[in-house]
UniProtKB/Swiss-Prot annotation:
It catalyses: (1S,2R)-1-C-(indol-3-yl)glycerol 3-phosphate + L-serine = D-glyceraldehyde 3-phosphate + L-tryptophan + H2O. It comes from Brucella melitensis biotype 2 (strain ATCC 23457). The alpha subunit is responsible for the aldol cleavage of indoleglycerol phosphate to indole and glyceraldehyde 3-phosphate. Belongs to the TrpA family. The lineage of its organism: Bacteria, Pseudomonadati, Pseudomonadota, Alphaproteobacteria, Hyphomicrobiales. This is Tryptophan synthase alpha chain. Its EC number is 4.2.1.20. One of its GO terms (cellular component) is cytosol.
Length: 279
């Protein structure tokens, strides 16, 4: 099974550069605006899109992403509408991978089989489900693999050598290395330690390693890019969108332009870093 994620990372490896993986919250601040943001991301330089599934109790998310999820839910966003966003995007872009990220409760209530059928039909390529450990592979991971959808796992600085093989077992697409312990949007980790961790994980897998949590600026993204196959940026993009909203969470400025300006700067920095390192 070769997915869009596999194809994208193979292309980037041939180009000698890492991926820019961009996260935003589905339905934030409303469905129409979020869909415009999603469609604009690849043109701004995003290689992979992480599409957040808003949830009422997001335990791993920092204040910015929690607020984005709340805005989306208040605007009427549902899992069905998030899948609709993927389907609308896919009609115009058949190459950029879409990874849906969120919590298992949403999928469980929707129905696993129904969700996987609808996700595949909508052009979704991968899933990151932060609260579903490898011991529960039969719940979603294995059915997703059978449906042709990558199941992407998180590793952290506390994932030891005993735990790592269990985390990597049945993982596909790429490995998401969380560069620090804590919630999204916290301070960036020491890049040298990130490099050590990535090299260590690579001894146990051939999958690309993408690093996220705490990456906010083009300079930080460039520093991480020297060590990883991909850089994940989420909170900074969510904050760029939020900066164009009023106190009630309604659009007052141009969230699409704000998000794409940031992504363009991130993409330029990430790509230049690897090119400089190769010279």
């Amino acid at each position: 099974m070769t997915t869009r994620i596999d194809t994208k990372f193979a292309e980037l490896k041939a180009e000698g550069r890492p991926a820019l993986v961009t996260y935003f919250m589905g339905g934030d601040p409303d469905l129409e605006t979020a869909l415009k943001v999603m469609k604009a991301l690849p043109k701004a330089g995003a290689d992979v899109i992480e599409l957040g599934m808003p949830f009422s109790d997001p335990m791993a998310d920092g204040p910015a992403i929690q607020a984005a999820g709340l805005r989306a839910l208040n605007a009427g966003q549902t899992l069905a509408k998030t899948l609709y966003m993927a389907a609308k995007f896919r009609k115009e872009d058949d190459t950029t991978p879409i990874v849906m990220m969120g919590y298992y409760n949403l999928i469980y209530i929707y129905g696993v089989e129904r969700f996987l059928t609808d996700a595949k039909a909508s052009g979704v390529d991968g899933l990151i489900v932060v609260d579903l450990p490898s011991e529960m592979d039969a719940e979603l991971c294995i059915p997703a693999m059978k449906a042709g959808i990558n199941f992407i796992r998180l590793t952290t600085p506390t994932t030891d050598d005993k735990r790592l093989p269990k985390v990597l077992h049945n993982s596909s697409g790429f490995v998401y290395y969380v560069s620090m312990n804590g919630i999204t949007g916290a301070a960036i980790a020491d890049t040298a330690k990130v490099g050590e961790a990535v090299r260590h994980i690579k001894k146990s897998t051939d999958l690309p390693i993408c690093v996220g949590f705490g990456v906010k600026t083009p300079e930080q993204a460039a520093a991480i890019a020297t060590h990883a196959d991909g850089v994940v940026v989420g909170t900074a993009i969510v904050n760029a969108i939020a900066g164009e909203l009023d106190e009630k969470g309604k659009v007052k400025g141009d969230p699409v332009a704000a998000a794409t300006r940031l992504v363009h700067a991130l993409a330029e920095s990430v790509r230049a870093t690897r090119l400089e390192a190769a010279q």
